[in-house]
């Protein structure tokens, strides 16, 4: 979930320590990311060093995460 925070930290409600101040702000960011992930996706380098090469790899990453279950 760290990559959601990195991707949407400027579009959500944050406190001074780069944390979501409300659970709903975090959930809204995650939903927006998942909704928009497939539009023009080519590849991505995630903050943890993971490199996602295509849409299929991104879908597999999401399916394996707790949010994808």
Indicate where each model-derived feature is located.
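Generic structural motif
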Residues: 8-10, 23, 49
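Short, mixed-charge low-complexity intrinsically disordered segments
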Residues: 35-69
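Short aromatic-glycine-(Arg/Gly/Cys) micro-motifs in beta-strand/loop hairpins
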Residues: 1-16
């Amino acid at each position: 979930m760290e990559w959601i925070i990195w991707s949407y930290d400027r579009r959500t409600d944050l406190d001074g320590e780069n944390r979501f101040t409300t659970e709903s702000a975090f959930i809204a960011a995650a939903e927006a990311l998942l909704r928009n992930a497939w539009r023009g996706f080519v590849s991505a380098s995630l903050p943890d060093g993971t490199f996602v090469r295509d849409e299929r790899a991104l879908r597999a990453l999401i399916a394996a995460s707790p949010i994808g279950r």
